[in-house]
């Protein structure tokens, strides 16, 4: 979607965002017929974008783009990284009132 590319262009104006090891993205936009435009991008963090999108679906979040930036600091987090990434997204969505179902 053009709007998602525009959001990423704006975010990439930040040196910090550009320097992130991964900018994991998911979006979910409602359509007039009740279906959704939705997709994700792992940005090299295998399976992370899909997990973010699953969070958006479970939360029934609508008309949102979520980007979680991750900087590799030398410590391998293993599977725990998915919990950290989704928790960051969930906190952001909750602060905006975008959690409409229990996740």
Enumerate the language-model features and the residues they cover:
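Phosphate-backbone binding interfaces of nucleic-acid-interacting proteins
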Residues: 63-64
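C-terminal regulatory domains involved in ligand/effector binding and gene-expression control
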Residues: 1-46, 94-101
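Solvent-exposed alpha-helical segments within well-ordered globular domains of core cellular machineries
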Residues: 6-9, 54, 87
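Short glycine-rich, acidic/polar surface loops and turns
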Residues: 49-58
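Active-site-proximal loop/helix of nucleotide/amide-processing enzymes and allied scaffolds
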Residues: 49, 68-103
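Generic secondary-structure microfeatures
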Residues: 28-33, 56, 70-71
């Amino acid at each position: 979607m053009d709007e998602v590319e525009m959001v990423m262009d704006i975010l990439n104006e930040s040196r910090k965002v550009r320097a992130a090891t991964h900018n994991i993205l998911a979006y979910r936009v409602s359509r007039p017929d009740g279906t959704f435009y939705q997709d994700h991008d792992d940005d090299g963090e295998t399976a992370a974008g899909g997990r973010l999108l699953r969070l958006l679906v479970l939360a029934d979040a609508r008309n949102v783009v979520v980007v979680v930036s991750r900087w590799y600091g030398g410590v391998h987090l293993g599977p725990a990284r998915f919990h950290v990434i989704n928790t960051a997204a969930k906190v952001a969505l909750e602060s905006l009132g975008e959690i409409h179902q229990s996740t």
